[in-house]
Amino acid sequence: AAEAYMIVSHPQWQRARQMVADGAIGRVLHITGGFSYDNSDDPQNIRNQAAMGGGGLRDIGVYVLGSARYVMGADLENISAKIRLESGFDTFASMQGNMGDATYSAYVSTRMHPHQEMVFHGSAGLLRLTAPFNANIFGEARIELHQPNLGLRVERFPAANHYVNQVEAFGHSIRTGAAYPWTLEQARGTQEAIDTILAIGTDLA
């Protein structure tokens, strides 16, 4: 079983994972992420309906959490969180913890100006994805590799479509039995982290 989790079918994420595994930024020490948009003017939206499983964490928390888990190959542990609720659903959540040896800090919001970014900060460099989740819609998909002595290498992915790639990967898996890039077990791990954040998060005024 698998989940239709499109970002892992995008070459920018496949490349980011490979670069981290190859030691391009040294030892990963800290991960930061953010994903926000504002749908406050649409009260009937399912994301604004507590009874229908609304809230930012269930909608976009899967991306700031799942993407980091994909790159690091580790689960979020030692979790702490702060949550702002509105009519029973979260409109802002900040979360902290550890993924392997790295610390982790991220936020999601459905009441803030649109923004998305993921950063992997290592002992020998920094990897930044500028449009990590809505590639070529929010902005051009690209990876910035910041290196010593103000070195900067940028890899661009202007033509990639992760939805097309996802369908092709699914078809390839069906035809050949090849592993699908995001299993049900991986999806469950992200959902367990979200459930923990919702359960232990401290309410913000």
Regions found by a protein language model. Give the residues of each.
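Contiguous beta-strand/loop segments that form the cofactor/metal-binding neighborhood of enzyme cores
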Residues: 65-136, 157, 167-178
